[in-house]
Amino acid sequence: MEYTTLGNTGATVSRLALGCMSFGSEHEWMLDEEEGRELIERAIDLGITFFDTANVYSNGESESILGDVLGEYDRDRFTVATKVYGEMDETNPNSGGLSRKAIEQELANSLDRLGMETIDLYQIHRWDDETPIEETLAALDDAVRRGKVRYLGASSMWAHQFAAALHASEREGYDRFVTMQNLYNLAYREEEREMVPLCEREGIGMLPWSPVGAGYLARPYEQDDATVRGEHETALGRPYREGGGEEINRRVEELAEEKGVEMAQIALRWVAGKDVVDAPIVGTSSVDHLEDAVEALDIDLSDSDVEWLEAPYEPVRVSGHE
């Protein structure tokens, strides 16, 4: 396993993060506690030290499963990231959003489910139009100062919103975001227009989610919805098939055959090879696929390979935070 620093901090993380959205019971393709344990333990064996979850994943089940397993190890070995924003209780109007009240109560709940005293990376899951960003940043800064959170991150939003948040942090003297978790893969590169340059300029580490397009770049074009998870992603209307998406898929397939590897490994290696990317978030329900993901880091993609893979891309609809 390769390791890197998180954003412009000194914290060391593995070059892949295990995404834990698949833990729980919200959808039929998800993993129960026993299956989740097997995946987490194998990730640890492979050298993965970075785990990403969220309070809304199966309404807290994901955090609980992750916390139960990591609680049996030396906590200091791992970097645990979770998120806040989504509604957790429809009877409680303050269980979602990014108000001070919501952040304080949901942070406490996440710490309890994870069985931890401190969260390494606390991320805002989306932008909250209903709450002044200064209120959100003040609450997050308080969490850092109280020792409940070590670092702050953001996820899927417009670049102008992220820039406003960074500026407000500097103006008010608040702890600033060090990471951006956004939708980014070979078939969806709209982030390169504004978000990627912003992150590069500000020293923000990117943690791309869906680096293989929830399977779109892991199987031939005609088999896009061949799995239950693939059908779920197709139903969300991701624009992977738009623009040059079909040709990109076919080129990933061709290069994978040429190199004797899996399509998903080519797609993942492309993402991991971007300088602005610290660690792609690998979400999988299979130990075999997890092992493939780790092996993907050793694949050699030449400059000409990268140029050839990228060439068919055309602008598509903005997705991930619409």
Question: Which positions does each model-derived feature cover?
Answer:
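Beta/alpha (TIM)-barrel catalytic core signal, keyed to glycine-rich beta->alpha loops juxtaposed to Asp/Glu
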Residues: D128-A311
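Active-site groove signature of glycoside hydrolases
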Residues: L111-E130
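Active-site mouth loops of central-metabolism enzymes
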Residues: S22-E34, D89-E104, H125-E130
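Conserved beta-strand positions
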Residues: L18-C20, T53, T82, L121-I124, ...
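Acidic (Asp/Glu)-rich catalytic clusters
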Residues: N8, D68-R75, T79, L111-G115, ...
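Structural motif corresponding to the early beta-alpha repeats
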Residues: Y73-L98
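Short, acidic/polar
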Residues: M30-A43, L98-L114, F162-L166
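N-terminal binding-site loop/beta-alpha segment at the start of enzyme catalytic domains
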Residues: M1-F78
